[in-house]
Amino acid sequence: VPAMIQVMILEPQCPETDFSSLAYILYGGSPIAESLLRKAMKTFSCDFVQIYGLTETGNCAVCLPETAHTSSNTNLLKSAGQPFPGVSVAIVDSAGKKLPPSQIGEIWLKSPAKMLGYWKLPEATAKTLVDGWIHTGDAGYCDNEGYIYICDRLKDMICYAGENVYPAEIENILYEHPAIQEVGVIGVPDEDFGESIKAIVVLKAGMQAKALDIINFVRGKLADFKLPRSVEFVQTLPRTPSGKVQKGKLREKYWQGYQRQVN
């Protein structure tokens, strides 16, 4: 996962290590910041391949091959790739209607390797597997060439003043900040706008930054409604054993007393 790539790059011995025998790095599991991917490609000087899929789809469903990582179309570095042969992808709205290219919706996958169902969990199966389609819970879109772009987990989407904001888009920008080592963007309760955007930041050792510096770094790179409204500095971010940031744990203390983590 991207977090492991970042840990390797931050390892003090990394600049002195000979990686000439390294042929491929396969990565996936969570969105990767473009700045981190470019740094990794330069550091390891090997081929990179991204894999996207779920356990429910037989893991591998979409692939961004090594050739796409070095394509003149640099926008492909933001993509998860194209479906493997035999895999179908649909981008749908909340009513299950298929959306045209460039429109964001939920990613559905149909694969010959998809699960039959969850063991002894018929309700969960009925919710996730519908008419042969796996409902991934991921928000994304496709382009005219069939490349899939993942925005974020639907459950992590922030609704600010009626606008849908995907944290990964903001995090991708913030990872370019020279003082930021890690960042997680979440929605917190806001009486006026429903949810407000908060950036939880881990600074690099020996680096300093103020909240306004972080906010202004995003200004001009994204629409104003996507700017963080507040910043909290912490020592570490909670992660799963595989290295994914646990957004639910980041939100917990802000949503205590609320019946749901959306306002």
Q: Which residues make up each language-model segment?
A:
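Acidic/polar alpha-helix N-cap and adjacent early helical turns
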Residues: E252-N263
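Gly/Ser/Thr-rich phosphate-binding loop
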Residues: I9-N75, S88, A95-K98
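AMP-binding/adenylate-forming catalytic core of the ANL superfamily
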Residues: V1, S111-G117, K127, A139-K226, ...
